[in-house]
């Protein structure tokens, strides 16, 4: 091989022992087979077979980075559905919010309720700027919105999908759809035997490199390295083949959802957007902020979705039956709110409550709040009195609603839970329980709020796995 010829030339060159050692480790890092007579002959097979289980964002990034670092490796992405990157296709309303500028994030815990310490560590190697640059260098111009969310300039998720699929095709990464992993067995030769359930529909992606396989049935294949990038599972059973190997599983539960509100009159305000607001759960330290959207079932918008993420386990433990507090005026200092209300009373004593909206609240919401307090819209501001002012301030800053269950957030279904990070080598993301098995993406106990943070975690963890899976 050309690398053997290079090594022969190296032997004739005048280089120090230290330089030779560095060159050895460099080529070992690239998984290049060394000369057969080298005293530290690389013990990897010349054709390293790698399986990536899950054709999502993390899986593709792991495969592409692995192929870049270990070009000799035979890499196949296995996807259980009939097409890859389905979740990428719908995220951001079909526009693909692929990352975030993180300019408004001072502490990663704000974005990653679970896994923030690991993400901080991994961001030193591949962060949002690296992801931004990677896509632009691979032909996808990006734009950053005012809310710091990053989208393809085309505003079409297929720009991202086409980039990933075409890059995989160009590098020779194979893609097999309709392959569902059902079991993993450790073999004596340190390979991993994978059992797949193959559906009747032929499972290769059109235009991508693919090996032949049975049209349906059970298929067994052994690999030297395996990366699990299957995303989150709504039920514990989805992790059975991993728990059977000895991995600890943090209970999977939903972590990004809307709230069903019991108050029928409140839901009549559907379509009303209030921004920004504070949301919180009384009696806890759980809180969030951002725009709030009133829907026909209750509450949505970033202020609710963020709260649902941070409070995922608390909400699950309470069967999604809790009180939510809304601070409609986005002001935590009650004294300042009192000053504002007193200023309105002094300046407009004879005007009706309905005619002056504190903090420029939406008209429909303000009328609803007046009636919720038990006042007539025609009541004059001068007639509020101290008791009335206190009630108004409390309503503006701590308005309570009963949550009766959770709704769905169709643009981004996320779960918390998954493979316990205590089972993972935090540098390589290789399993401590099963050698040669790696993890990336939401299958790990890492999840984020809405805004491109979950996809960034997929790019980052996929990149790290791709750096090490061929070593």
What are these regions (language model features)?
Residues 119-127, 147-166, 233-237, 381-388:
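Short beta-strand to alpha-helix junction loop
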Residues 231-233, 237-240, 245, 445-471:
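A conserved FAD-binding loop/helix module that cradles the flavin
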Residues 52, 56-58, 83, 232-233, ...:
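Residue-level detector of alpha-helix initiation sites
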Residues 89-119:
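N-terminal glycine-rich dinucleotide-binding loop that anchors FAD/FMN and/or NAD(P) in oxidoreductases
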Residues 48-77, 469-470:
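N-terminal Rossmann-like FAD-binding beta1-loop-alpha1 element of flavoenzymes
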């Amino acid at each position: 091989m050309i690398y053997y010829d290079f090594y022969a030339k190296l032997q004739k060159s005048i280089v120090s022992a230290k330089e030779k050692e560095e060159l050895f480790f460099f080529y070992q890092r690239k998984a290049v087979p060394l000369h057969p007579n080298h005293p530290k002959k690389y013990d990897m097979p010349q054709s390293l077979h790698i399986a990536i289980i899950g054709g999502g964002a993390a899986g593709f990034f792991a495969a592409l980075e692995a192929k870049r670092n270990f070009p000799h490796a035979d890499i196949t992405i296995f996807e259980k559905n009939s097409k890859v990157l389905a979740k990428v296709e719908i995220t951001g309303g079909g526009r693909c919010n692929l990352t975030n500028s993180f300019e408004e994030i001072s502490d990663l815990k704000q974005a990653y309720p679970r896994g923030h310490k690991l993400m901080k560590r991994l961001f030193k190697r591949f962060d949002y700027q690296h992801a931004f640059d990677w896509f632009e260098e691979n032909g996808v111009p990006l734009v950053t919105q005012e809310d710091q969310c990053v989208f393809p300039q085309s505003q079409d998720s297929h720009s991202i999908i086409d980039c990933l699929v075409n890059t995989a095709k160009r590098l020779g990464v194979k893609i097999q759809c309709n392959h569902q992993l059902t079991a993993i067995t450790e073999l004596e030769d340190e390979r991993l035997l994978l059992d797949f359930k193959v559906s009747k529909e032929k499972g290769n992606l059109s235009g991508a490199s693919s090996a032949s396989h049975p049209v349906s049935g059970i298929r067994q294949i052994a690999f030297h390295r395996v990366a699990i990038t299957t995303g989150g599972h709504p039920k514990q059973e989805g992790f059975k083949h991993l728990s059977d190997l000895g991995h600890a599983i943090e209970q999977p539960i939903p972590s990004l959802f809307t709230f069903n509100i019991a108050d029928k009159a409140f839901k009549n305000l559907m379509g009303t957007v209030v921004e920004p607001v504070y949301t919180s759960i009384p009696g806890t330290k759980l809180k969030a902020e951002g725009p709030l959207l009133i829907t026909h079932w209750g509450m949505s918008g970033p202020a609710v979705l963020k709260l649902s993420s941070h409070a995922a386990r608390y909400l699950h433990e309470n069967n999604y039956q809790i009180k939510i507090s809304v601070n409609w005026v986005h002001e935590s200092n009650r004294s300042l709110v009192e000053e504002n209300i007193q200023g309105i009373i002094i300046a407009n004593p004879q005007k009706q409550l309905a005619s002056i909206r504190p903090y420029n609240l939406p008209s429909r919401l303000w009328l609803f709040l007046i009636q919720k307090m038990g006042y007539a819209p025609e009541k004059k501001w001068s007639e509020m009195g101290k008791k009335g002012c206190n009630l108004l301030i409390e309503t503006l800053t701590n308005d309570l609603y009963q949550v009766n269950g959770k709704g769905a957030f169709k643009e981004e279904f996320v779960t918390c839970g998954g493979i316990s990070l205590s089972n993972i080598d935090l540098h390589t993301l290789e399993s401590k329980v099963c050698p040669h098995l790696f993890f990336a993406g939401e299958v790990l106990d890492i999840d984020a709020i809405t805004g491109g943070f979950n996809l960034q975690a997929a790019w980052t963890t996929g990149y790290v796995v791709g750096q090490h899976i061929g070593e």
